[in-house]
């Protein structure tokens, strides 16, 4: 997706506003844990925070121990990352003896993947920071389409002066009522490089126009927790990975790291959920582990209306993502 100089200027304006809503201020030291290649998140957030008057630390993706050392060496105040990578940084930092509470870090700007409330709360508690989400997609600009303010953290303000939004039924394409769930459709109003009209994002959300407690009058969208094309159909039942994530983040014995496998057994769909135990939750007793497994399976079945097989994985047994986390492995016969 191409950008001209005008597009880059508009993009950085949108990011600067988003960052300011999240509590970033001129003079902040912003450490970038996104890559700077063809991924739009890195450059967009870099230029936007720079326009706000921040000092940028272009650390890039990977090398987690170096990231943690740089927070201490440079006095980083803002971290830009995916939430799954921020959680991985928590774990590595604690293993190294890094004191998050004593660090200069105070704000997390997260994007690239959904951040459920349970995961956000865990990162905030372990890093001693305030975490906010932002939303965007490469096809219409990149990050900066909408962002979370500190007054009402369950929604994100849409940059309505740059994007015309619609919410439609994903099956029929017909508009849905205000506050009703549907597929977000966006038309960039200022994009010149590659303009698009009524771009169907496949992201499921609802939009609300009532005023926000922060005083901004921009419409707010619910945080995107699923996509119409992420949906798994298991034995005729619609299952979203976000539903599984919501259940697992509410169970204190397991970490937010998980892996979903779908395969065919005897001509039927089988759903397998691998979830990682916290070290303090591990028990030598087979009966205790089996009881925990059964409890998780029952909670998932109550939400999904499909009975999954639950596998408990040892601490650290699920691979950590540096960029966007890939949670689903669909092995079904095509």
Regions found by a protein language model. Give the residues of each.
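AMP-binding/adenylate-forming catalytic core of the ANL superfamily
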Residues: 79, 185, 189-306, 322-323
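Conserved active-site and cofactor/substrate-binding residues in soluble primary-metabolism enzymes
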Residues: 3-6, 10, 84, 114, ...
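Conserved beta-strand termini and adjacent loop/short-helix elements that scaffold enzyme active sites
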Residues: 59, 134, 168, 263, ...
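Detector for glycine-centered tight turns/loop "hinges" at secondary-structure junctions
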Residues: 97, 172-173, 305, 323
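Active-site glycine-centered loops adjacent to acidic/histidine catalytic or metal-binding residues
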Residues: 112, 136, 236
């Amino acid at each position: 997706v191409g950008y001209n100089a005008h597009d880059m200027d508009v993009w950085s304006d949108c990011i600067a506003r988003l960052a300011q809503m999240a509590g970033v201020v001129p003079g902040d030291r912003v450490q970038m844990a996104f890559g700077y290649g063809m991924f739009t998140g890195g450059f967009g957030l870099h230029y936007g925070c720079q326009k706000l008057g921040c000092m940028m630390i272009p650390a890039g993706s990977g090398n987690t121990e170096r990231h943690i050392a740089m927070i201490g060496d440079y006095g980083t105040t803002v971290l830009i990352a995916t939430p799954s990578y921020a959680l991985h940084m928590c774990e590595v930092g604690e293993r190294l003896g890094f004191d998050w509470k004593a660090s200069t870090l105070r704000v997390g700007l997260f994007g690239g993947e959904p951040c459920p409330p349970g995961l956000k709360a865990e990162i905030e508690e372990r890093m001693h920071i305030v975490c906010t989400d932002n939303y965007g997609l490469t096809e219409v600009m990149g990050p900066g389409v909408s962002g979370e303010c500190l007054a009402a953290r369950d929604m994100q303000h849409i940059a309505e002066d740059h994007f015309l939004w619609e919410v439609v039924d994903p099956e029929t394409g017909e508009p849905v009522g205000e506050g009703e769930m549907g597929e977000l459709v966006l038309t960039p109003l200022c994009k010149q490089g590659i303009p698009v009209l009524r771009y169907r994002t496949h992201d499921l959300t609802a939009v609300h126009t009532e005023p926000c407690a922060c005083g901004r009058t921009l419409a707010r969208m619910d945080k995107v927790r699923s996509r119409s094309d992420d949906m798994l159909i298991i034995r005729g039942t619609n299952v979203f990975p976000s539903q599984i994530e919501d259940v697992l983040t509410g169970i204190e014995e397991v970490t937010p790291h998980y892996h979903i496998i779908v395969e065919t057994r005897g001509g039927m769909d089988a759903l397998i959920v691998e979830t990682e135990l916290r070290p303090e939750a591990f028990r030598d007793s087979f009966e205790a582990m089996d009881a925990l497994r059964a409890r998780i399976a029952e909670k998932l079945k109550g939400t999904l209306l499909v009975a999954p097989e639950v596998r408990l994985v040892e601490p650290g047994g699920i691979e950590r993502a540096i960029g966007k986390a890939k949670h689903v492995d669909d092995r079904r016969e095509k």
